[in-house]
Amino acid sequence: MSTYTIPVGPLHVALEEPMYFRIEVDGEKVVSVDITAGHVHRGIEYLATKRNIYQNIVLTERVCSLCSNSHPQTYCMALESITGMVVPPRAQYLRVIADETKRVASHMFNVAILAHIVGFDSLFMHVMEAREIMQDTKEAVFGNRMDIAAMAIGGVKYDLDKDGRDYFIGQLDKLEPTLRDEIIPLYQTNPSIVDRTRGIGVLSAADCVDYGLMGPVARGSGHAYDVRKQAPYAVYDRLDFEMALGEHGDVWSRAMVRWQEALTSIGLIRQCLRDMPDGPTKAGPVPPIPAGEAVAKTEAPRGELIYYLKTNGTDRPERLKWRVPTYMNWDALNVMMAGARISDIPLIVNSIDPCISCTER
């Protein structure tokens, strides 16, 4: 067998963020993949130890734009565990609304990029146009289109009055039928999508367990793990929703899981807007921070996000560390790419929705 090596990245038109792949190929088939990280390392975990507990909310929001609610929420949960603060019920519902709003926008961005990679740019623009409904909603409700700045220690920074609820529901009423009746059927049946994604980048459920995969990548292979179900936080244990699961473990299944989850997220937001009780949106003043340790986890758009926080009795953490889904998922690219065509590499990489800024932190 005569093989040769193709370098892809760190700057490449098919990559959303800098990654370097050293890909060994035999003809048009991929034999092995070596991934090199470190191109956007920013030392954020170290920076967190030089900032106080309030400044770190802003810092964690900037770990990743698409997960900019998950990071500060998980950080706040860890800090609340150490201080013993109890988040008011209304604030818990508002946290879920912010969480699911970001999930819809994140998933839509990923599947839009899929359409762009296969050359279906009219579909890409259609998805991005529909995504603007959520972007406009974020700007109107939270004041920002990307880093929505919704989280506070012991609660949230925003609230929804009747007009705000009505506006939110109106936006969902515009988005949901567009996804359900116009966009998702194209991903399910259009040959431009189906022929390029079915049977590509296959992962078995056993592979998911072996590699510790999570998020839509694992659920696309039928591996039923979702923090919102297995270890519910906020008010997810009071909400009615089904976990989205795929059957084939390929690029297409992962895209379909993201579409199903987008619709599920819309349903969760509706439930929260309907059931949210009256009351405060934040607990009382933050008490003095005792020395202690805590671990918190949430279901970010890409999968399980874990934060470890160690405090020493001051207002600055002694250690703040997070483990993101991409860190676990990208090793499985070796399995997904083995035997794949060179032209399928961008599709396979995009299917794990890699967030390099999260991972290299």
Curated annotation (Swiss-Prot):
Cofactor section: Ni(2+)
One MF annotation (Gene Ontology) recorded for this entry: NAD binding
Binding site for Ni(2+): C64, C67, C355, C358
Top-level taxon of origin: Bacteria
SUPFAM superfamilies: HydB/Nqo4-like
Transmembrane regions: none
Keywords: Metal-binding, Nickel, Oxidoreductase
InterPro entries named among the record's database cross-references: ComplexI_49kDa-like, NADH_Q_OxRdtase_suD, Ni-dep_hyd_lsu, NiFe-Hase_large
Family affiliation: To E.coli formate hydrogenlyase hydrogenase isozyme 3 and to bovine mitochondrial NADH-ubiquinone oxidoreductase.
Protein task: The carbon monoxide dehydrogenase (CODH) oxidizes carbon monoxide coupled, via CooF, to the reduction of a hydrogen cation by a hydrogenase (probably CooH).
Protein name per UniProt: Carbon monoxide-induced hydrogenase
Organism for this UniProt entry: Rhodospirillum rubrum
